[in-house]
């Protein structure tokens, strides 16, 4: 029943007519792509491994369903990458190998993933940057293995000392962004 409701929601959004320009999203040239979800996962830890084949089939079937509704637009998963695939490159690759998936996505959140210190990013900035850049390279290589493009569709780093104050420094974040954009 949940999957039926999910597909109803997909159909509603894809066929919705934009209230401003009157164009259905499926026909709107400004809509490049659809994603299955934000950060879909087969599970959140090693206990998710038994779910992988069901997840992989869900990716294939759902991407195919979207493709039927929107054949002129691209389809991807919305995955955060290997980090959201039980940490396994093979799971990430297999989920994106479906012919219904046009390109790979991945996200990069080094503080969330404990590659950098949330409250003091500068303390582990060098090692966090090294790990982040290696993560990018891994995903570019995986996409090449599948012969598909990839998109780093989310990334970020906190202000210095984890502050939300606009007056707080962004030294570590600036260095992080420079490294990511240079890659």
Placement of each model-derived feature along the sequence:
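Active-site mouth of glycoside hydrolases
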Residues: 1-116, 124-149, 155-181
